[in-house]
């Protein structure tokens, strides 16, 4: 978008523009400027203190600059403000730890190989009443696909969907999820960078609408023990010269199979990025549809990677372990880098399954070469430290990310020790609610 065009889009009521980026956790950060400074934000950038942003700079060298991307300009329908995403710079160069910049560079590497990545997410969330404590009240008792009186939140879902096009998101399916007060709104796939932006926007819209109704929306992976967790399955495909290269004559192409092979090979390290919280691993337990075993299959929802039945031009894979606590820019960069590694080195997929993996004996899983995903954030971080490809995907953010997450894990272990709780507890603790509820 030409900046002069974007300036002409201003509604007279728009007086301020929010400059939005995300921190190491994927949490939106930013600042507001008068609308008259938008052109300056695009051309010269607006400086800010990077030491105040989790995972960015230290106080001894904290000056960063945000440059707005005018193509992302939107006006917030319920407020007299506009929003814009952008890229971060340091010393007049792209800042190496900028999450959005990291994904941009990963996509440029894909493009050098002739590929363009498309991703469609399925983010799940809960709606709660909060009464001043961490006793979460459930406002409805609906279940999966309920559309009758048990589903009290249908109007809230519709309102969220009505606002989404104003932010460039196209809603496709709205429904109640399995858990009481759990919901899902799927939106149309797009190019990977746009989809990552869309995830940040979707969480913003959902939380804002929930608040209008006196509720809290949480994307925390497992807010309640004994209830289904919030996932964010990713539907992924690659195109080349406008054609879906995952499309084979029957089923998937060789490129798609190698892409799967790359993800399977790096799955143990990837999970530290796609499921980056202590709480994430309380969702990834047997008994629910969240995957635990490293496997793949056609139509099989017990596998880590499912190939949906829609082949031909709609050919894609569904990566089922990610959750909405992930920083979408980091997660997409890591997954695409792993898949590209599979394509470059022609890694064949392994651990193909047609039956329910959870119902297999341990002996059968071993025979098929099916391994288990890390069972905790600590285990996942150990795997990440050993994986060159996934580490490189995070670029200059890797060091800050791994250090930040190790401190997070150690803080949790200290809490458990203080409360005399076992390290492998699957109970959702107050420590987790305080830390992750508003992610």
Swiss-Prot record:
One of its GO terms (cellular component) is cytoplasm. Its main location: cytoplasm. This is Glutamine synthetase. PROSITE patterns: GLNA_1, GLNA_ATP, GS_BETA_GRASP, GS_CATALYTIC. It is found in: Cytoplasm. The lineage of its organism: Archaea, Methanobacteriati, Methanobacteriota, Thermococci, Thermococcales. It catalyses: L-glutamate + NH4(+) + ATP = L-glutamine + ADP + phosphate + H(+). Probably involved in nitrogen metabolism via ammonium assimilation. Catalyzes the ATP-dependent biosynthesis of glutamine from glutamate and ammonia. It comes from Pyrococcus woesei. One of its GO terms (molecular function) is metal ion binding. It comes from the Archaea. Residues 12-93 form the GS beta-grasp domain. GO terms for biological process: glutamine biosynthetic process. Its cofactor is Mg(2+). Binds 2 Mg(2+) ions per subunit. Oligomer of 12 subunits arranged in the form of two hexagons. Mg(2+) 1 binds at residues 122, 233, 318. SMART domains: Gln-synt_C. Disulfide bonds: none annotated. InterPro entries: Gln_synt_N, Gln_synt_N_sf, Gln_synth/guanido_kin_cat_dom, Gln_synth_cat_dom, Gln_synth_gly_rich_site, Gln_synth_I, Gln_synth_N_conserv_site. Belongs to the glutamine synthetase family.
